[in-house]
């Protein structure tokens, strides 16, 4: 517990908008878990992350730290789509990988993720939370032309998950508090999901460019922070998965519909 408290204090100490956390998988979310928040209509995000191997879903495929990069677009006010590439090294003693590729980043796993916001926060009822559904990496075939939406085999679909999420924000004297709950499901054998995830985030009143995050992602307890600079165009992400494994990311955000603040 002391370790978690010290880390939160460090995150605050480093940082003496309206930024949302950027999930390490490329969608708007917390750290690992998806939530029901949505970027503004017309927002485009380009980003990348350093991912500790414990942050990756398949230990046989990623037994090493890696990186990803992604493109994220929000349109029609309620739909968000991301395209994510995660770097892969050639593995020794696998026929698929020539010896000259061993332990080198020579390939990448590609997948799509999407989220639809069914209900906006405060819509229909002032206490209504936002509600969203979505999917990450819905296909699993390494060849052929079929799509297995259950992704119950080991081939590809490494990041597969379906989800339904709810988010509610509260304005407190301390700052803006977000409470998030998400049900996650897949049929993966190497990374099964069929559980609830919970998270909170706090944007302190004294410094709203800072976003402190804690979550249980249905597997581990993670803590981290997002820091927004240059009017929310750049966002820096820092995470401790399970309180000890470091991942970090950087995103650039711009809105194609205008209204960008460049000061």
Predicted feature residues:
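Transmembrane beta-barrel domains of Gram-negative outer membranes and organellar outer membranes
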Residues: 20-162, 167-173, 206, 225-227, ...
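Short, surface-exposed linear patches
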Residues: 67-71, 188, 202-204, 234-239, ...
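Active-site beta-loop-alpha junctions enriched in small/polar residues
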Residues: 86, 136-138, 182-186, 217-219, ...
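Detector for outer-membrane/organellar transmembrane beta-barrel domains
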Residues: 151-217
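Accessory, usually C-terminal, subdomains that scaffold auxiliary metal cofactors
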Residues: 215-257
């Amino acid at each position: 517990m002391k370790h978690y408290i010290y880390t939160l204090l460090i995150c605050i100490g480093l940082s003496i908008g309206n930024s949302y956390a950027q999930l390490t998988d490329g969608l708007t979310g917390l750290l690992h878990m998806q939530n029901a928040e949505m970027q503004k209509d017309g927002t485009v995000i380009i980003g990348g992350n350093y991912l500790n191997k414990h942050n990756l879903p398949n230990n046989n495929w990623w037994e090493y730290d890696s990186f990803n990069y992604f493109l994220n677009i929000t349109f029609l006010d309620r739909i968000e789509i991301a395209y994510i590439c995660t770097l892969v090294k050639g593995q020794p003693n696998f026929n698929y990988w020539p010896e000259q590729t061993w332990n080198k980043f020579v390939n990448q796993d590609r997948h799509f993720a999407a989220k639809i916001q069914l209900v906006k926060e405060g819509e229909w009822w002032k206490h209504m939370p936002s509600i969203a559904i979505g999917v990450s990496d819905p296909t699993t075939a390494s060849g052929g032309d079929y799509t297995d939406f259950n992704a119950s085999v080991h081939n590809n679909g490494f990041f597969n998950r379906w989800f339904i999420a709810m988010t509610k924000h509260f304005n407190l004297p301390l700052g803006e508090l977000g409470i998030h709950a998400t049900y996650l499901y897949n049929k993966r054998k190497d990374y099964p999901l069929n559980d609830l995830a919970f998270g909170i985030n706090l944007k302190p009143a004294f410094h709203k460019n800072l976003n402190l995050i804690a979550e249980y992602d249905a597997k581990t307890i993670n803590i981290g922070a997002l820091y927004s600079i240059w009017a929310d165009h750049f966002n820096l992400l820092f995470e401790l998965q399970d309180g000890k494994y470091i991942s970090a990311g950087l995103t650039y955000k711009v809105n194609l519909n205008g209204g960008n603040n460049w000061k």
